A protein has these predicted regions:
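Phosphate-coordination/substrate-recognition cap region in phosphate-metabolizing enzymes
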Residues: 42-117
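Active-site glycine-centered loops adjacent to acidic/histidine catalytic or metal-binding residues
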Residues: 10, 85, 176
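Acidic, low-complexity terminal tails and accessory targeting/binding regions
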Residues: 2-3, 89-101, 161-170, 181-224
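Short glycine/proline- and acidic residue-enriched helix-loop micro-motifs
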Residues: 110-147
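Active-site-proximal alpha-helix that buttresses catalytic centers in soluble enzyme cores
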Residues: 2-3, 8-76
């Protein structure tokens, strides 16, 4: 038996628009973020896709995305389990900072997005450098690459095992872009060097109790 994990990045937020570091820091969904979450739900419903259980990061932007999508899909009564395991990377003292200031301070690169797109930086390098730069904080809550990967992998495995144990066929899990990409690298999926996921995109994985088989990546077809 297998179960399907439909892993969704949250909708667009105010910090996304303002280009601010957004890990544990939270900002509300924009009007577009709300509309995209609802469009995702409607698109899934039109394709006859329903969920047996639903999970979301306990950060508001993810939990709100999950609720909006499920309500739009006609699954208003499906409860959402919020979990810290699906959270975004913790950036410590850099939370809420403009991404260009963050990139300049840590790497001497003035344009964060351009550096990512040009592959001057990887998500792993950013996370490892961020935790190292937070060593002056006690406790140091910033996460490096391995910490994020292990946390998300353990969480998704637990979710998958619970679904299999209950005979659930399909699970929604709303998380965050960087964390999802780090996890995909961890399980050996080739992201093609992609360092950003689209808001409200779907990444699908089939779980057999031991292994994940990624069958869809950064898919926006249900929001259109």
């Amino acid at each position: 038996m297998t179960t399907e994990l439909w892993i969704v990045r949250h909708g667009q937020t105010k910090f996304n628009v303002e280009d601010r570091v957004q890990g544990m820091a939270n900002s509300d969904l924009t009007d577009k973020g709300i509309a995209d979450a609802r469009a995702l739900g409607r698109g899934l419903a039109q394709d006859g896709i329903t969920f047996d259980r639903a999970y979301a990061s306990d950060l508001t932007r993810a939990a709100d995305t999950a609720r909006l999508a499920l309500d739009a899909a006609g699954q208003e009564k499906l409860a959402i389990t919020e979990t810290v395991g699906l959270r975004e990377e913790n950036y410590g003292k850099y939370e809420g900072q403009l991404t260009n200031d963050f990139s300049q301070e840590l790497f001497g690169l003035p344009n964060f997005t351009a550096a990512l797109l040009a592959h001057q930086l990887t998500l792993a390098q950013i996370a490892d450098a961020t935790r190292a730069a937070n060593e002056d904080r006690v406790p140091n809550r910033a996460e490096d690459n391995a910490m994020v990967q292990n946390r998300l992998d353990q969480t998704l495995r637990t979710i998958g095992q619970e679904a299999l144990g209950e005979g659930d066929r399909r699970v929604l899990a709303v998380s965050h872009g960087t964390a999802i990409l780090m996890w995909l690298n961890f399980i050996g999926f080739d992201t093609g060097g992609q360092e950003m996921l689209h808001n409200a995109s779907v990444t699908g994985a089939v779980f057999d109790g031991a292994h994940f088989n990624v069958v869809d990546f950064d898919d926006l077809k249900w929001t259109k």
